[in-house]
Structure formats: structure tokens, C-alpha cells
Amino acid sequence: MTIKIGINGFGRMGRLTMRAAYDWQDVEIIQINDPAGNAETLAHLMTFDSIHGRWHHEATHIGDAMVINGKEIPCTQNIKTDDTDWSQCDIVIEASGKIKTKALLEAYLKQGVKRVVVTAPVKEEGVLNVVMGVNDE
């Protein structure tokens, strides 16, 4: 079964997530949202990285979609979580750095997302913060 992933926030953490997950056979990136960049900008940032160098896949764009190896990934530029359709995602990677409260994160779950992975600490009761290799058992 393929796990469908959406990424909200395509800064450093969002792009590193994409680089890591793109080649996994059981994972498909199906949605990217970043208010700061259109599909053309995101494709350029995906291709060139000052630390990791050029990505081994070709990332281009067609309209509002990033195209990687012929596969189109819709890109939106919405500020509010509710303005992006996350309903087809099994998991959303919340990498914007802005959505860090339980109330704001629940907007994803209301759209049918099964899990949300936040790339920043959530400093609120009742939210599990897991650091791989430290408290992931």
C-alpha cells in the first residue's frame, strides 16, 4: 500500500523531507503547500541545494504543479490550512514552523488526514513530541 504524503511548508525541512522520501517505493508525495513560492520557485529550490548539491531527479514545473520525472505534484500557496485540500493525504508533514498548537493541527485531521508529523516542537499538553533515537521506543 502506498502512503500518500502532503508537505506544508517547503523551506529547509520540507525540501529535506521531499529529498528523503521521494525514492521510497511505498511513499508518494501528492501535495505541496508553501505561501512563499510558486511551483517554478519550489522546483528550482528542489533542484539546487547549497549543502547537498544538485538533486538527482529533474524537477520542473507546469502551471501550478511541480513535475518530477514526469509526475505532477500540485503546489498551492495558501496561508490557512483549511484553504488547501489535504483530504487525499494519509500523512501531512507540517514543516511551516507556524502551526504548532493542537487546535491548529486538528484542521488537518478534520479533512481526513490520519497523521500529522510536525517538524518543530509542539509545546502543549496532550501532544506527543518524538525525537528519533531519543524517545521513539
Please report, for each region that a protein language model flagged, where it lies by residue.
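N-terminal Rossmann-like NAD(P) cofactor-binding subdomain of oxidoreductases
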Residues: 1-137
